[in-house]
Amino acid sequence: MEFKLKHKDGMARVCEITTAHSTFLTPVFMPVGTVGAVKSLDANDMKNELDAKIILANTYHMYLRPTSKVVKDFGGLHGFTKFDRSFLTDSGGFQAFSLSKNSKHFNEGIEFKSHIDGSRHLFTPKSVLDAQYDFNSDIMMILDDLVALPATKERVKISVDRTILWAKEAITYHKNMQNKGIGIGQNIFGIIQGGTDYEERKRCALSLNEMPFDGLAIGGLSVGEENALMYETVQNLNPYLDENRPRYLMGVGTPEDLVENVERGVDMFDCVMPTRNARNGTFFTSFGKFNIKKAEFINDHEVIDPTCSCYTCRNFSRGYLNHLFKAKELTFFRLASLHNLHYYLELARKMREAILNNSFTQFKRNFYHLRGK
């Protein structure tokens, strides 16, 4: 992976990342294709309608079904999905933690029960990389020990100890596998844990900074803490993060979260919010968000957002979308998802432009002004 820090405006950064499958600028938002597809969309939508340069797939889900071996047989995620740009795969640890009842965390890994058939599995630092080698993802995430917030200081310390231990195991294993010709062209990111505890976050960041990861992620946020505490945690981490590696805030978040954390030096984001909210009838716009199911939109000839150039806003009215939603027409999911993802990707583009023009502060002021804040 090639990484270039191109420009800074305060702590906000524009970087260029090149993988084996695409080159993209940051700040970047990565649409989430949990099971190998962004819900209701296909590779053509992602490339030609949205021009997404990188998307995320989930190791937990793809490992359980169709299995990593099946994906490998199709030539990895790129051959399986026909999306020929970059893929980032998470380790599956979050889903093992959140979807599996009675998951157990040990120093060896995470034992969990499949939400599909109840079978038991063990994720270890090595096994999650083995699955991601099969996927041939461009960026692989290591296994980390996530805790729900609030958590006791003792549990947070255990989480950081395990995450550092697993990071060492993962980076050593990855280098050994590359020496054997496996994982060539695949990159590996470490994940910083520590809850909202300043000292534990710092300890984890400093430890992972010493390891030869291609990038560093901030995990374990947006899991119950107040937004202000998340922003403070990210800002406090900034001095301890290597400036010459990508910074990825996992699972975040709202448009406001993206703006606030870009201001604090974050480069990469992913979240299911644009597509999940789309399926529930909620649209993100330059002036805030609203739900299309309200009666006021039944005879509304206006498009979702007059300033938007997405496929949906170029072609369809609020009245039509209101009808599709109430009729439970599957077409609605695609049209709504196209709009919301276009909004997020365009937000990232506008932030890049503002940073390059040294006008991010003004951009942020206008962003909130349009929302009446």
From Swiss-Prot:
Catalytic residues (positions): 90, 270
A Pfam family: TGT
Positions annotated to bind substrate: 90-94, 144, 193, 220
Domain of life: Bacteria
Record pathway: tRNA modification; tRNA-queuosine biosynthesis
Keywords carried by this UniProt record: Glycosyltransferase, Metal-binding, Queuosine biosynthesis, Transferase, tRNA processing, Zinc
GO biological process, one term: queuosine biosynthetic process
UniProt cofactor note: Binds 1 zinc ion per subunit.
GO cellular component: cytosol
Needed cofactors: Zn(2+)
InterPro entries: TGT, TGT-like_sf, tRNA_ribo_trans-like
GO MF, one annotated term: tRNA-guanosine(34) queuine transglycosylase activity
The keyword Transmembrane belongs to this UniProt entry's keyword annotation: no
Function: Catalyzes the base-exchange of a guanine (G) residue with the queuine precursor 7-aminomethyl-7-deazaguanine (PreQ1) at position 34 (anticodon wobble position) in tRNAs with GU(N) anticodons (tRNA-Asp, -Asn, -His and -Tyr). Catalysis occurs through a double-displacement mechanism. The nucleophile active site attacks the C1' of nucleotide 34 to detach the guanine base from the RNA, forming a covalent enzyme-RNA intermediate. The proton acceptor active site deprotonates the incoming PreQ1, allowing a nucleophilic attack on the C1' of the ribose to form the product.
Recorded family membership: Belongs to the queuine tRNA-ribosyltransferase family.
Protein's recorded name: Queuine tRNA-ribosyltransferase
Natural source organism: Campylobacter jejuni (strain RM1221)
Gene: tgt
